[in-house]
């Protein structure tokens, strides 16, 4: 891990606090988050992405806006329960990420997780992300079974992705289920990519 100077650490802290405040402005009354400030509709992927950031920030000691996280949790659980598979939109990946964030927050929706797992034709990204959710709740055997049936999807444009984002998510899942050799291989590939001058998405 890199040790930051005090000035750099203060800068990081300031930026995280500013991000939390700015993202909160995008939260709707139903608890979801819109893509843009002033938006009228929640974006499923963005809602999970912001919630993921909230959880990690809170773990580091940052204070979240009052009530914001609970509203997000309520929204995520409602959407998880009401979700219906629409293969043409690839929304299985969005559901898997939603379920992962709920598990990460300590509020796993096991019923929704099991329903998604029972579908026969979900994407590689969805299976792998769902595997991470199962690993987080201690069901390592189920997680590994899902993980071992997956390959790396080349792209996921609908959800702002790339093969490198997918590899990073695969690396995390591998770590969660204890497959350190797989995780190390992807970490080396990602590190090499990050050290290059190639364009990478924000995710």
PLM regions: where:
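Large, well-folded core regions of big proteins
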Residues: 1-203
